[in-house]
From Swiss-Prot:
Identification of the protein by name: Alanine aminotransferase 1
Biological or metabolic pathway of the protein: Amino-acid degradation; L-alanine degradation via transaminase pathway; pyruvate from L-alanine: step 1/1
InterPro entries for this protein: PyrdxlP-dep_Trfase_major
Catalytic reactions on record: L-alanine + 2-oxoglutarate = pyruvate + L-glutamate
Residues of this chain annotated as glycosylated in UniProt: K11
Entry similarity comment: Belongs to the class-I pyridoxal-phosphate-dependent aminotransferase family. Alanine aminotransferase subfamily.
GO (cellular component) term, any one: cytoplasm
Record note on modification: Glycation of Lys-11 inactivates the enzyme.
Amino acid sequence: QELASFHSVSKGFMGECGFR
């Protein structure tokens, strides 16, 4: 369960970084 939360945050952070 915690892994999913971490994955979601990591994906959002990486996506935002790539978007900018």
